[in-house]
Amino acid sequence: MSTSAQQLGGNVFATPPDEPMGLLRSWLDAARADAVREPGALALATADADGRPSTRMVQVLAVRDTGLLFASHSGSRKGRELAANRWASGVLYWREVARQVVVSGPTGPLGADEADALWMARPVATHPMSVASQQSAPLTDENALREQARQLGDGGVPLPRPDAWLAYLLEPESVEFWESSPDRLHRRLRFDRDGTGWRSDRLQP
């Protein structure tokens, strides 16, 4: 395990903080400092109204006291599933530092102002394809889609956010921190919402 990870290690499990989000930010910062290849890559699982699951990778845009922020098209599979069933679960796995965090809870879209701000913070070069693409719809003509995106990007200026491009917040009901141990007594610490606060428990590996 790297130096940055070690500095945030054992004491956290022996004496947990009162809430998990500050610890999650610290672990994410440590992953970045230790050159984890994609520290913000979240494996996000959703399910439809019948409970049939699907999973994909999304990018965590921010860790707030209220949850994890990411963006997606409302017409994508995850967008449709979240509209039917708000519960989701995501895993941040950092192989390089032998850690993972699992965050589970209700997930829904934020307001237009926040979505606009996130959209405008993205590189302008990402705008044309995000505007042209109807995410998860069948691709019938790849060249036509590429040409549409090229034309949209000809001006090299920011494009308006598509109505379907939304900011989502995963509001945790539970957060579990896991850290590998050579003796297989891997360290696990789970936080669960308890009224207005949090309860924490050490778990067996």
Where are the model-predicted features located?
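Binding-site signature for planar aromatic cofactors or substrates
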Residues: 1-205
